[in-house]
Amino acid sequence: MVGGERFNIPVPQSRNITKNHQQLKNRQKNKDQNSQMKKTYMKKERGHGCNSLSGAWQAMQKAGKNNVHFPCNQNWSPNLSNRNLFFSPQTNQNYAGAKFSEPPSPSVLPKPPSHWVPVSFKPSDKEIMTFQLKTLLKVQA
């Protein structure tokens, strides 16, 4: 045998075909088993969740959408259902948080680190920085 020669050894094809066929069958069996497991799991899950509500659901369908009656609550007051109560501005309550309608004063804003800001300021630079700061505040608010 010389260094660059290659001998082709024939491999029986029938053996590979049966092996591939077995693998294909096994895959199909696994798929079938998995789908059956999923179906039984879903049935159990659906049945478990719906059994407790099925009586209420049937009663609601029998009664119709407009005829659903809720038990009377003694603590409920008709004054609480007034729409103006929910949508009226509540000015008598003190709110300690920030008012977002008003921009904060510049004295409250944090100062940038000294290495970020150039030492010498021209009046035009200050105007540009204030304009940029105001636009940033408008975007965030």
UniProtKB/Swiss-Prot annotation:
Role, per record: Involved in nonsense-mediated mRNA decay (NMD) by acting as a bridge between the mRNA decapping complex and the NMD machinery. May act by targeting the NMD machinery to the P-body and recruiting the decapping machinery to aberrant mRNAs. Required for UPF1/RENT1 localization to the P-body. Also acts as a nuclear receptor coactivator.
GO cellular component: nucleus; P-body
Protein name: Proline-rich nuclear receptor coactivator 2
Subcellular location(s) of the protein: Nucleus; Cytoplasm, P-body
Domain of life: Eukaryota
Biased composition (Polar residues): 11-21
Pfam families per record: PNRC (PF15365)
Keywords assigned: Activator, Cytoplasm, Nonsense-mediated mRNA decay, Nucleus, Transcription, Transcription regulation
Organism: Gallus gallus
Family: Belongs to the PNRC family. PNRC2 subfamily.
Residue segments, region Disordered: 1-51
Keyword DNA repair: no
GO biological process, one term: nuclear-transcribed mRNA catabolic process, nonsense-mediated decay
UniProt short sequence motif SH3-binding, positions renumbered to this chain: 101-107
